[in-house]
């Protein structure tokens, strides 16, 4: 695979089936978000919903929302399938990365890093005077957590039993909310 042939672009509605394929191949069923949630994300904040293409195939995505920075985070803000229509604020100052995945066969090539860096490096085009970037990562995803820590993110709170793996094994992982101040 030639990483130089990766194209990053804004998502389109006709990408939805491929986005869902990536979602379902990347996460346990109880963690996957609904089709309508992704459609709403595309329609509400298309500039913050990027896809990676390789040979004209969508192989990864990252989507985000703009929130108003709040020191006192509410667990309800992070619910799976929450409505971007209610959470997204065009006048906000915090970028929340709501979902991020790459097809399994294309992992380990740096595609996730390309998507993540493209979104975060262009934050000033998305938000006027950005204050921070926020995301949630499963406690058991230690390699992802270390990547975020190396990029300057800090753990700010724990969402108990946030990730439900019941369709794979009887296990729930805590979600770690991480924030990077800009």
Description of each model-found segment:
Residues 102, 108-123, 150:
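Conserved acetyl-CoA-binding loop-helix of GNAT-fold acetyltransferases
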Residues 107, 133-145, 161-173:
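Conserved beta-strand-loop-alpha-helix junction that forms the acyl-donor binding cleft
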Residues 5-19:
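A short beta-loop-alpha structural element at the N-terminal edge
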Residues 63-99, 160-171:
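Conserved acyl-donor/pantetheine-binding loop and adjacent beta-alpha core of acyl/acetyltransferases
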Residues 95, 123-138:
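Conserved GNAT acetyl-CoA-binding A-motif
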Residues 113, 125, 139-158:
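Conserved active-site alpha-helix within GNAT-family acetyltransferase domains
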Residues 29-54, 58-69, 82-86:
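Active-site rim helix/loop that mediates acceptor-substrate recognition in acyltransferases
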Residues 6, 57-61, 95:
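Glycine-rich phosphate/pyrophosphate-binding loop shared by adenosine-nucleotide-utilizing enzymes
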């Amino acid at each position: 695979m030639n990483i130089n042939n990766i194209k990053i672009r804004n998502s389109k509605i006709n990408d939805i089936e491929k986005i869902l394929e990536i979602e379902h191949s990347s996460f346990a069923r109880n963690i996957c978000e609904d089709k309508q949630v992704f459609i709403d994300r595309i329609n509400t904040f298309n500039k913050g919903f990027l896809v990676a293409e390789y040979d004209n195939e969508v192989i990864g995505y990252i989507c985000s929302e703009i929130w108003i920075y709040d020191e006192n985070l509410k667990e309800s803000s992070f619910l799976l399938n929450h409505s971007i229509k209610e959470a997204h604020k065009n006048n906000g100052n915090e970028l929340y990365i709501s979902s991020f995945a790459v097809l399994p066969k294309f992992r380990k090539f740096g595609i996730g890093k390309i998507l993540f860096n493209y979104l975060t490096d262009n934050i000033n085009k998305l938000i006027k005077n950005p204050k921070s970037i926020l995301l949630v990562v499963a406690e058991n995803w230690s390699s992802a957590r270390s990547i975020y820590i190396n990029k300057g993110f800090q753990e700010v709170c724990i969402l108990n039993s946030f990730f439900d793996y019941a369709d794979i094994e009887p296990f729930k992982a805590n979600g770690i909310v991480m924030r990077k101040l800009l």
